[in-house]
Curated annotation (Swiss-Prot):
Domain comment (free text): Possesses an unusual extended V-shaped dimeric structure with each monomer consisting of three distinct domains arranged along a curved 'spinal' alpha-helix. The N-terminal catalytic domain specifically recognizes the glutamate moiety of the substrate. The second domain is the NADPH-binding domain, and the third C-terminal domain is responsible for dimerization.
Record's protein name: Glutamyl-tRNA reductase
Residues passing through the membrane, by range: none
Lineage of the organism: Bacteria, Bacillati, Actinomycetota, Actinomycetes, Mycobacteriales
Organism annotation: Mycolicibacterium vanbaalenii (strain DSM 7251 / JCM 13017 / BCRC 16820 / KCTC 9966 / NRRL B-24157 / PYR-1) (Mycobacterium vanbaalenii)
Subunit structure: Homodimer.
């Protein structure tokens, strides 16, 4: 059995799709119950945030498990399976492990390095555990992911990476138009990056912030938060953007959309009513870009995009922290997978030792029958000698096979051991079931990774 991830996030879908897929606490339990009704799925967990909905499951078969999860999410969202898969990404086995570790480390967030997602992973696991839908595989995977996330945040400066991008953009803007103190700003996007941008704009001394977002309630919530700091703020839907540009000095965009949301026509309309010539700075923090590239060619408009931002020393330092975090994730993935492979060979080794013990006991019984007059002391000495010989013969190969099993492709060594010593697979499975204890499941990790959408 392997881990399968089926997800949709800000990287693969527009906000409208994420809204259709949104999952609250009661929805989570319902979704998992539906997924687990299939015999192909043995464990499941839902990770739901404002920027992603992901189902992690332990499945008996890749295609069967994928079909089950896709159908459940299709019914939940009201989208056809065909439309859903246009925005979905799939990770399997090693790739699923790497993805969850990256998510926990803040590397897949709209704001690189944000810590909120670590708590969201913890709550996703706690909810699944409370509903008894995680077994040994997802338990171990989740606990390791949480540990990796903590390590990334404690050993790198990635926490400041997102803030660095915004601050570098605003510093660049000030070089063009001077101090932002007392200025008017338009903020396009009210997600986690938008909240961070609002904070940086307030620190820069802006007098007024107009928050524009596809969903007005979300914009209103951010505007209310801004007002709590004594700054004038109002919320507007997207179609109000052009008139807001007329009085704006700076625009910051960070929507996470998959295509530009600020068009050349929008900016044309906004600047058409400007009474006196002015410079407008637009900081496009979107990846991919939020602003139509043609906007940069308009007179009086200066666009600061991610390409320009990442050329700045501070932003490059933040990128270095992200690279360091990715290095940690890669090392932890390799360590986790090696541990899983070693754990998989353990039942085979245990079955081999049990087989050897059974042979020893059978031979000692045969000895008792052939030499009934053998006194207890001599009998014990013979028994101990035979057991020591068997233990010494088995020690080197069993230790070595565990070491070799930790390497990629190491499962072949366990198979060779079963063939060489004619170990009954049912006996090995019985040992494995005993060693798993109350947590069901296992993790036979392969290397298949599939994308239904290459934007992820």
């Amino acid at each position: 059995m392997s881990v399968l991830l089926f997800g949709v996030s800000h990287r693969s879908a527009p906000v409208s799709v994420l809204e259709q897929l949104s999952v609250d606490d009661s929805d989570q339990a319902k979704l998992i119950d539906q997924v687990l009704q299939s015999s192909l799925v043995t464990e499941a967990m839902v990770l739901s945030t404002c920027n992603r909905v992901e189902i992690y499951a332990v499945v008996e078969a890749f295609h069967g498990g994928l079909s089950v999860i896709g159908q459940v999410l299709s019914e939940h969202s009201g989208m056809s399976l065909q439309d859903l898969t246009k925005h979905a990404y799939v990770r399997y086995a090693e790739a699923a492990v790497e993805h969850l570790f990256s998510v926990a480390g803040g590397l897949d967030s709209a704001v690189i390095g944000e810590q909120q997602v670590l708590g969201q992973v913890r709550r996703a696991y706690a909810s699944a555990e409370a509903n008894h839908t995680v077994g040994r595989t997802l338990h171990e995977l989740s606990q390791r992911a949480l540990a990796v996330g903590k390590r990334v945040h404690s050993e790198t400066g990635i926490d400041a990476a997102g803030a660095s991008v915004v601050s570098v953009a605003l510093d660049t803007a000030e070089k063009k138009v001077g101090s932002l103190a007392g200025r008017s700003a338009v903020l396009v996007g009210a997600g986690s990056m938008g909240a961070l941008a609002a904070k940086q704009l307030m620190r820069a001394g802006v007098e007024r912030i107009h928050v524009v977002n596809r969903t007005l309630p979300r914009a209103a919530k951010l505007a209310e938060n801004v007002r709590s700091y004594g700054i004038t703020a109002e919320a507007f839907p997207f179609d109000h953007l052009p008139p807001l540009l007329t009085d704006a000095d700076i625009v910051v965009t960070c929507t996470g959309a998959v295509r530009p949301v600020v068009s050349l026509a929008d900016v044309h309309r906004g600047l058409a009513h400007v009474r006196e010539p002015k410079e407008l700075v637009i900081c496009d923090l979107g990846m991919p870009r939020d602003v139509d590239p043609a906007v940069a060619g308009l007179p009086g408009v200066f666009v600061v995009d991610m390409e320009r931002i990442l050329r700045e020393p501070t932003a490059r330092a933040a990128a270095t922290d992200a690279d360091a975090a990715r290095t940690i994730v890669a090392a932890e993935v390799a360590k986790y997978l090696a541990g899983q492979r070693m754990a998989e060979v353990t039942p085979t080794v245990t079955a081999l030792r049990q087989r050897a013990a059974d042979v020893v006991e059978a031979e000692l019984l045969r000895l008792d029958n052939r030499l009934p007059g053998l006194d207890a002391a001599h009998r014990d000495e013979v028994a101990n000698t035979v057991r020591r010989v068997v233990d010494k013969l088995l020690h080197a190969p069993t230790v070595r096979v565990k070491q070799l099993a930790g390497a990629p492709g190491g499962d072949s060594y366990a198979e060779a051991l079963r063939e060489l010593f004619e170990l009954d697979q049912h006996a090995v499975d019985a040992v494995a079931g005993t060693e798993l204890g109350p947590l069901a499941g296992g993790d036979e990790l392969g290397s298949l990774a599939i994308d239904l959408d290459m934007t992820e």
